[in-house]
């Protein structure tokens, strides 16, 4: 049984869904690809930790999530999403770099398609994938949100650096 709840965030309302405390979906309410929500039931408090971690992320206090995920997709999508989880907070990779990482050189467009089907936005950080020349390309939640997330992470990385040790 899939349970869901919404939460407010600096990038707009988010929908969390899953079974037990295991997250299967984290979506922006108006993103371009949304899963069917038929049969989803209100959650019973099981996502309190996920909401707490997301709040801490948006406050700049959390750089790595510790939430159990259940990613459902094709074998290729799974490989791409696992690769996304290796991109450090505050850093970016190109679609081509991810294609190379998953053993599919030249499949940058396929990586983009897998990103567009990422069921767990933000936590599986598809927003950290950019074009080869550094430009922002494609994001199911819109380029403004992608830029906001990248700026949040970059700001936190820059403010945590010390000039002199």
UniProtKB/Swiss-Prot annotation:
Listed Pfam families: DNA_binding_1 (PF01035), Methyltransf_1N (PF02870)
Q: What is its EC number?
A: 2.1.1.63
Catalysed reactions, semicolon-separated: a 6-O-methyl-2'-deoxyguanosine in DNA + L-cysteinyl-[protein] = S-methyl-L-cysteinyl-[protein] + a 2'-deoxyguanosine in DNA; a 4-O-methyl-thymidine in DNA + L-cysteinyl-[protein] = a thymidine in DNA + S-methyl-L-cysteinyl-[protein]
* Keywords annotated in UniProt: Cytoplasm, DNA damage, DNA repair, Methyltransferase, Transferase
The protein's GO terms of the molecular function aspect are: methylated-DNA-[protein]-cysteine S-methyltransferase activity
Q: What is its main location?
A: cytoplasm
Any one Gene Ontology cellular component term annotated for this protein: cytoplasm
Kindly list the cysteine pairs connected by disulfide bridges. none
| Enzyme class at the top of the EC tree | transferase
Active site: residue positions: 126 (nucleophile)
Gene Ontology process terms (BP):
DNA alkylation repair; methylation
Q: Where in the cell is it found?
A: Cytoplasm
**Domain of life where this protein originates:** Bacteria
Against SUPFAM superfamilies, the record matches this protein to:
Methylated DNA-protein cysteine methyltransferase domain, Methylated DNA-protein cysteine methyltransferase, C-terminal domain
Remaining remarks: This enzyme catalyzes only one turnover and therefore is not strictly catalytic. According to one definition, an enzyme is a biocatalyst that acts repeatedly and over many reaction cycles.
Belongs to which family? Answer: Belongs to the MGMT family.
- Describe the function of this protein: Involved in the cellular defense against the biological effects of O6-methylguanine (O6-MeG) and O4-methylthymine (O4-MeT) in DNA. Repairs the methylated nucleobase in DNA by stoichiometrically transferring the methyl group to a cysteine residue in the enzyme. This is a suicide reaction: the enzyme is irreversibly inactivated.
Question: Know the name of this protein?
Answer: Methylated-DNA--protein-cysteine methyltransferase
């Amino acid at each position: 049984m899939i349970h869901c709840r919404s939460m407010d965030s600096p990038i707009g309302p988010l929908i969390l869904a899953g079974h037990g405390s295991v997250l299967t979906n984290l979506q922006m309410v108006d993103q371009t690809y949304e899963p069917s929500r038929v049969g989803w039931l209100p959650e019973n408090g099981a996502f309190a930790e996920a909401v707490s971690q997301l709040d801490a992320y948006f406050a700049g206090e959390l750089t790595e999530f510790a939430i159990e995920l259940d990613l459902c997709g094709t074998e290729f999508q799974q490989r791409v999403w696992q690769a996304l989880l290796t991109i450090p907070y505050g850093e970016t990779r190109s679609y081509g770099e991810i294609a190379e990482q998953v053993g599919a050189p030249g499949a940058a467009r396929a990586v983009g398609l897998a990103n567009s089907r990422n069921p767990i936005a933000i936590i599986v950080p598809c927003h950290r994938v950019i074009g080869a020349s550094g430009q922002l390309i494609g994001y199911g939640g819109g380029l403004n949100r992608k830029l906001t997330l990248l700026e949040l992470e970059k700001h936190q990385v820059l403010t945590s650096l010390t000039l002199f040790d």
